[in-house]
């Protein structure tokens, strides 16, 4: 991530992925709180995720949205899909992302689908490998999306034209 993306300039849509009741065991019993996992995106190449924890669900969601807006990344899109195949990793979670032909749709499960749809990807094939914990799947997906590069960018780095690069 080179520079921070200003969330106030984007029309962000948010999606709650999971809400989890967590407990802290104290002498008098259990203290319950809620942990929320939220994905935000503008469906035009920007996406972020965040977590929030509070005593009430709406507060946890609000905190998660604020956190997600601080963690926005830019996703390079080629038409309605991604530039190339990539594997995203986080912990024991791994997500395989592969570009798809127009009209394929988003073939992804649960948390991965939320990230891809809000990033603006309309055609993609994906497979979740390893850990299926929502937070790990989202982090692995965001990791994969952040490592994507356009052919023009790679050609510029190597000092070649796109035609030379693609052969």
Swiss-Prot record:
Keywords: Ribonucleoprotein, Ribosomal protein, RNA-binding, rRNA-binding
Superkingdom of origin organism: Bacteria
InterPro entries according to UniProt: Ribosomal_Su5_D2-typ_SF (IPR020568), Ribosomal_uS5 (IPR000851), Ribosomal_uS5_bac-type (IPR005712), Ribosomal_uS5_C (IPR005324), Ribosomal_uS5_N (IPR013810), Ribosomal_uS5_N_CS (IPR018192), Ribsml_uS5_D2-typ_fold_subgr (IPR014721)
Keyword Ribonucleoprotein (UniProt): yes
Annotated Pfam families: Ribosomal_S5, Ribosomal_S5_C
Biological process annotations from GO: translation
Positions of the S5 DRBM domain: 12-75
One function term, GO molecular function aspect: rRNA binding
GO cellular component, one term: cytosolic small ribosomal subunit
Subunit record text: Part of the 30S ribosomal subunit. Contacts proteins S4 and S8.
Domain commentary: The N-terminal domain interacts with the head of the 30S subunit; the C-terminal domain interacts with the body and contacts protein S4. The interaction surface between S4 and S5 is involved in control of translational fidelity.
Cross-referenced PANTHER family: MITOCHONDRIAL RIBOSOMAL PROTEIN S5
Function recorded in the entry: With S4 and S12 plays an important role in translational accuracy.
Similarity field: Belongs to the universal ribosomal protein uS5 family.
UniProt protein name: Small ribosomal subunit protein uS5
Origin species: Bacillus cereus (strain ATCC 14579 / DSM 31 / CCUG 7414 / JCM 2152 / NBRC 15305 / NCIMB 9373 / NCTC 2599 / NRRL B-3711)
